Amino acid sequence: MQRLLTPVRQVLQVKRVMQEASLLPARLLPAAHPSFSTVPAVPLAKTDTWPKDVGILAMEVYFPAQYVDQTELEKFNKVEAGRYTVGLGQTQMGFCSVQEDVNSLCLTVVQQLMERTQLPWDSVGRLEVGTETIIDKSKAVKTVLMELFQDSGNTDIEGIDTTNACYGGTASLFNAANWMESSSWDGRYALVVCGDIAVYPSGNARPTGGAGAVAMLVGPEAPLVLERGLRGTHMENVYDFYKPDVTSEYPLVDGKLSIQCYLRALDKCYAFYRQKIEKQWKQAGIDRPFTLDDVQYMIFHTPFCKLVQKSLARLMFNDFLLASGDTQTGIYKGLEAFRGLKLEDTYTNKDVDKAFLKASLNMFNKKTKNSLYLSTYNGNMYTSSLYGCLASLLAHHSAQDLAGSRIGAFSYGSGLAASFFSFRVSQDASPGSPLEKLVSSTSDLQKRLASRKRVSPEEFTEIMNQREQYYHKMNFSPPGDKNSLFPGTWYLERVDELYRRKYARRPV
């Protein structure tokens, strides 16, 4: 990339970008400041209002170009049929070779988002990365992404990496919205990037892996608005999943404890969210309880798909315990035996699980099932998992179906940090609207997944062994065929004798 531009050439470049932007067809995005170089930002502190409808304007999803079939993996691992496909709810699992790392995943997804939206690179004023895939204890992924901004001369970009297991992406999204609704905002867009490679040692946990990245453009007048004041958060100190060994990319996991922590955090966050929305309603003259009926769609962080179905059932159980009216008819019919139970006593209660999984099945099919498409066929993407579910939901519904709805979201990161929050979808689903364009941008998700290469369990295992062999090595060029990557993918070209990483991009 060209490193420097003379002042004259910088001015010419800015003018050219502005002229080209004015000639584009109907813009994908509402206008913030198209170029900070020529349009002075007005500090928010000098205004009397918040920027309107801050949220997600555009999204881009990246996943690896190869996968292993979970049915074949069951046979290869000599486990009973259905352990992965039924027990976990997983059909396929995407994975990365040594050619890809978290930096390359994030480079790819950011470049693809910027190219598709045709935004000037200097229209971004904040970029934050959520990841738990740490390949350097000091140097952030965000600093590598700055390579993409060099030709524009834009180095005035706030934000850095945020890490806590699978929660970093959500923290980054909240930070972007907070920045935009503060006196620090300079009028430009924010980019939120979530990327991870989920890998486990050979054994029971390996089929719950995956890999991918999601980039989100955040700004005002968004089609997916973060509902202000409606975040229920729970945090505590627990060792359910953690990575203390810096010489390995594998975590230490207490699977049973982690599931209990996930469900306990869900209970806590849902209760806090419910309290806040009911308080808002009372201030508006509405005095009634909040339930899942007030959420048209519900997405979850997805370590594996079966846990998500159990989680929606758990939310229904929460509503049931608080229901003050008749619970002997309607959706709660046949559940009265569970009336006297306490949430904290039921995390391992199989009777509760079975009963509410059955009772909530129609609700699951309507509100959540479509959001699991990417997780089913690509696996766990850690920080980007929840937002892959959001993209899947958009890909399976029309703008007209989504318009005006509320999308509930539960984010969880082991250790632990969790939040329940919501998006309000724009009412405008007309052709060319920001919502219609956002939904249309996800329409190729199924086609892209179908275009991947299926790899045998034997080859998959060999590639996992290669990842172990090259992890934290220096002075090497990764093995593999660059042509096996999707066009436009960034990849690791070389690690030199000082551990410095060099990347290249496969031509589009």
UniProtKB/Swiss-Prot annotation:
It comes from Bos taurus (Bovine). The modification N6-acetyllysine is found at K243, K256, K306, K310, K342, K350, K354, K358, K437, K447, K473. The modification Phosphoserine is found at S433, S440, S456, S477. The modification N6-succinyllysine is found at K52, K256, K310, K333, K342, K350, K354, K358, K447, K473. GO terms for molecular function: hydroxymethylglutaryl-CoA synthase activity; identical protein binding. It catalyses: acetoacetyl-CoA + acetyl-CoA + H2O = (3S)-3-hydroxy-3-methylglutaryl-CoA + CoA + H(+). Succinylated. Desuccinylated by SIRT5. Succinylation, at least at Lys-310, inhibits the enzymatic activity. It is an enzyme of class 2 (transferase). (3S)-3-hydroxy-3-methylglutaryl-CoA binds at E80, A81, C166, N204, T208, S258, H301, K310, N380, S414. This is Hydroxymethylglutaryl-CoA synthase, mitochondrial. The gene is HMGCS2. Keywords: Acetylation, Cholesterol biosynthesis, Cholesterol metabolism, Lipid biosynthesis, Lipid metabolism, Mitochondrion, Phosphoprotein, Steroid biosynthesis, Steroid metabolism, Sterol biosynthesis, Sterol metabolism, Transferase, Transit peptide.
